[in-house]
Amino acid sequence: MTSSEAASPGATGRPLTDFEQVLLGVIASEPRSGYGLKKMFGSSPASVYQPSPGALYPALRRLAGSGLLRAEEQVSSGRRAQRMYQVTEAGLAVHLEWLRKPVVPETVGAELGQHLMRFSLMEKYLERGEVIAFLGDLGRALDGFVRGMEEFIAARPEIMRGHALLALEHGIAIHRASREWVGTAMAALSPMPGETSPVPGG
C-alpha cells in the first residue's frame, strides 16, 4: 500500500486515500459544502492535502456513494442551493480507524506529512493518552529513521560526498527537527501532577 492510501476501506472495500480521510475528518468537525471545502483548502498554508482542480468533488461523490458521507440540499434566502455534507456513523468509524492506524517505522519518512495531519485531527476524538502514545511511536520511528540514514552515510564514505551527502544531511536535519518537535508536543500534552486527562475535544 502506498503512502497515499489509507488502511481503512470504505463500504466498497476500496482503501480510502489520505485526502479522502482528511475530508472525513474536516467534515466530521463541521458539515460543509463542496464550495466551503474548496475555500478552506485554498486558504490553508498547508499544501500537503490541497486538492488539485477537479479532485475535490469526485472525492466527495465517492465518499457519499460509499455511505461515509450524507449530502443534503440546503437553500438560504436569496442564494443558490448548496449541497451540505455530513459524516455518517460509518464514515466516523472509518475515520477513527485511520486516526488510530499504527506508525510503521519503515515508512515514517514517506508518511511524515500524513502522520502530522492525523495528529492535527486527533484532538476532537482521541483521549490525550492515545495521542501521547501515538507521538511516542512516531518519535521512536523517527529516531530509527535518523539512525538508519546516519549509518548509511557512515558505511559508504567513498560515495557519500558532494551533493549526494548534502542532500542526505538535509533529510537527517528535517527528521531530527521533527523528532525534537515530537518531544515538545509530548511535554505540552502531558498532564501536570494532579491534573486529569480531558475528554476528547476538551
Feature annotation, model-predicted:
Residues 2-109:
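Basic helix-turn-helix/winged-helix DNA-binding cores
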Residues 18-19, 114, 163:
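Alpha-helix N-cap/N′ positions at the starts of helices
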Residues 97-147:
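Amphipathic alpha-helical dimerization/coiled-coil segments
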Residues 134-137, 162-178:
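An accessory alpha-helical subdomain
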Residues 142-153, 175, 182:
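Non-transmembrane amphipathic alpha-helical segments
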Residues 148-168:
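Acidic interhelical loop/turn segments
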Residues 172-194:
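Short, contiguous alpha-helical
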Residues 193-201:
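Short, charged, intrinsically disordered terminal tails
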